[in-house]
Amino acid sequence: MNLRPLHDRVIVKRLDNETKTASGIVIPDNAAEKPDQGEVLAIGPGKKDDKGNNIALDVKVGDRVLFGKYAGQAVKVEGQELLVMREEDIMAVVNK
């Protein structure tokens, strides 16, 4: 991927939701909600403080994160739909 986010921006790839419920009902693609979890593919250098130093981000490449349903800006890169969002749009990191 040839995409380098700036400042406190993060590139996230949505993770697919389950297409079958616990009771075995299959959910068609057009009825499923957008996933609110994703994998961090790239991070920017961070925001700058008052002295011009970068403040490192709390997330890192490979983290599985939770975010709001409408967070980020959707972009298509090399045929993949990705989200560009600020770190503050990420609500949590999912521990494996």
Swiss-Prot record:
Q: Which PROSITE patterns match?
A: CHAPERONINS_CPN10
Q: Disulphide bridges in this chain?
A: none
User: Chaperone among the record's keywords?
Assistant: yes
Task: Establish whether keyword Chaperone is in the entry.
Answer: yes
Among the GO molecular function terms of this UniProt record, one is: protein-folding chaperone binding
Q: Which GO terms describe its biological process?
A: chaperone cofactor-dependent protein refolding
InterPro entries this protein is in? Chaperonin_GroES, Chaperonin_GroES_sf, Chaprnonin_Cpn10_CS, GroES-like_sf
User: Per the record, GO CC terms?
Assistant: cytoplasm
Query: Which domain of life does this protein belong to?
Result: Bacteria
Provide this UniProt record's keywords sorted from A to Z. Answer: Chaperone, Cytoplasm
The entry's localization annotation reads: Cytoplasm
- The main location class comes to cytoplasm
Q: Which family does it belong to?
A: Belongs to the GroES chaperonin family.
HAMAP family with a match to the protein in the record: CH10
* Subunit text: Heptamer of 7 subunits arranged in a ring. Interacts with the chaperonin GroEL.
Role this protein plays: Together with the chaperonin GroEL, plays an essential role in assisting protein folding. The GroEL-GroES system forms a nano-cage that allows encapsulation of the non-native substrate proteins and provides a physical environment optimized to promote and accelerate protein folding. GroES binds to the apical surface of the GroEL ring, thereby capping the opening of the GroEL channel.
Name of protein: Co-chaperonin GroES
The source organism is Cupriavidus necator (strain ATCC 17699 / DSM 428 / KCTC 22496 / NCIMB 10442 / H16 / Stanier 337)
